[in-house]
């Protein structure tokens, strides 16, 4: 059977495509009931602006929906890099788009909010997997049980239904030699819905917090497996087939903070073959559940060489999905490609051009290509918060390491800048 590329799959009904990154909407979430959390309005503004990444997956004949219009300098920067930009519609809400029913919406995530909009505009099409199937797949506990039933290797862990079983699980994991544990609730992606526990004091604090706020306990406590590689696979699932689109490595610092994605992970031939086999096997189970479209699976290869193929499934597009066309293009010319996320606070009021000039100055003598593909900024009373995404393409690992160092130096400089 002929492979239908995802971009063609999304165009099968022949209507105008409207890309929509509703990244702030959840399919389901219970994390806030269990774990202490603080709302940060600046961070929420930053998250919305990550919709700029839609520009790289959309085709010129498509339309993208933005809540916030990117700076013209950012759009000109990409025109100079020969990116054919789609049409852009900028509104506060998707419902404000004129003649909405003439579009086929391709969202970041299918949600109750989006389905409610569909009820209001019945002729508007949405290409997305079934929400009930997504919820079943995103449920961390159901996914773990499904993998166990089908012979997949899973982390050492225990389901906990009360405070006593949670205490017992922690004691068991510490006795088994784990120095850290991960406490999970059923739902929550991108680090939401889990807490890393690195000592008993933190465990006792969390235990008391949960005990004071919950009557029903539904948790999973897992031992922390030291990672050699934190892998993510992108799958495209149709009615009849499962396709592996990409295998990437998440770059995580010692504090567990996400720093970027390595698009050329260091897997041996046998490791890559084993990983592919297990991921496609997991994908087939997901296909049988009725899922259709793109999704991401998080995996780990630990320091003992043990592969745990399914840690978490995100039944939606991922941010890696959006820049895959850009990555594929760079991999034709460069051996090493990775994205870097740069986050800093500064009193300086920087625009895209300011930062791009500083970036060019710092990396001028380095024989690598650096693309600034997302510029997010949120202004506050005393500081401005910035989050930038860059794609670094290099011919060898030495160049890549040097580029990382220069980017970190620039981050430090920007933090202390006044401008």
Swiss-Prot record:
Residues reported to bind Mn(2+) 1: 298, 312
E.C. designation(s): 6.2.1.39
Signal peptide bounds: none
Organism: Niallia circulans (Bacillus circulans)
GO MF assignments: acid-thiol ligase activity; ATP binding; metal ion binding
Cofactor: Mg(2+); Mn(2+)
Name recorded for this polypeptide: [Butirosin acyl-carrier protein]--L-glutamate ligase
Record-listed ATP binding positions: 174-231
Single Gene Ontology BP annotation: antibiotic biosynthetic process
Cofactor binding, per record: Binds 2 magnesium or manganese ions per subunit.
Pfam families referenced in this protein's UniProt entry, alphabetically: ATP-grasp_3
Record-linked SUPFAM superfamilies: Glutathione synthetase ATP-binding domain-like
Residues that, per the record, bind Mg(2+) 2: 312, 314
């Amino acid at each position: 059977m002929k492979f239908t590329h995802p971009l063609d799959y999304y165009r099968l009904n022949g209507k105008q495509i409207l890309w929509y990154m509703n990244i702030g909407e959840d399919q389901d979430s219970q994390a806030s009931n269990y774990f202490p959390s603080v709302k940060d309005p600046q961070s929420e503004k930053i998250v919305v602006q990550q919709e700029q990444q839609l520009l790289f997956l959309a085709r010129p004949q498509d339309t993208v929906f933005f809540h916030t219009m990117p700076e013209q300098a950012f759009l000109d920067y990409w025109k100079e890099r020969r990116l054919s930009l789609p049409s852009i519609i900028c509104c506060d809400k998707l419902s404000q788009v004129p003649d909405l029913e003439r579009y086929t919406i391709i969202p970041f995530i299918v949600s109750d909010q989006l389905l409610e909009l569909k009820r209001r505009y019945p002729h508007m099409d949405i290409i997305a997997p079934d929400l009930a199937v997504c919820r079943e797949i995103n449920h961390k506990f159901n996914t773990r049980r499904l993998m166990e039933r089908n012979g997949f290797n899973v982390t050492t862990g225990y389901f906990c239904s009360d405070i006593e079983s949670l205490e017992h699980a922690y004691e068991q994991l510490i006795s088994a030699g784990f120095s850290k544990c991960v406490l999970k609730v059923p739902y929550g992606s991108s680090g939401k819905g889990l807490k890393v526990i690195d000592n008993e004091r933190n465990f006792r604090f969390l235990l008391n917090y949960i005990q004071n706020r919950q009557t029903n306990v539904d948790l999973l406590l897992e031992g922390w497996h030291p990672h050699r590689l934190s892998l993510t696979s992108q799958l495209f699932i149709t009615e009849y087939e499962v396709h592996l689109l990409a295998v990437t490595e998440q770059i995580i610092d010692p504090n567990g903070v996400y720093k970027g994605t390595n698009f050329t992970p260091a897997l041996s031939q046998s490791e890559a073959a084993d990983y592919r086999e297990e991921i496609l096997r997991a994908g087939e189970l997901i296909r049988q559940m009725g899922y259709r479209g793109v999704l991401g699976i998080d995996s780990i290869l630990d320091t003992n060489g043990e592969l745990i193929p399914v840690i978490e499934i995100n039944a939606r597009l991922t941010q890696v999905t959006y820049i895959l066309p850009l990555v594929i293009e760079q991999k034709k010319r460069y051996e090493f490609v990775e994205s870097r996320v740069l986050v800093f606070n500064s009193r300086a009021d920087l625009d895209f051009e300011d930062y791009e000039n500083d970036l060019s100055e710092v990396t001028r003598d380095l024989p690598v290509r650096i693309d600034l593909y997302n510029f997010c900024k949120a202004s506050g009373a005393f500081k401005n918060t910035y989050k930038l995404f860059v794609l670094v393409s290099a011919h060898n690992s030495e160049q890549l390491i040097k580029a990382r160092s220069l980017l970190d130096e620039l981050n430090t400089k920007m933090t202390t800048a006044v401008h």
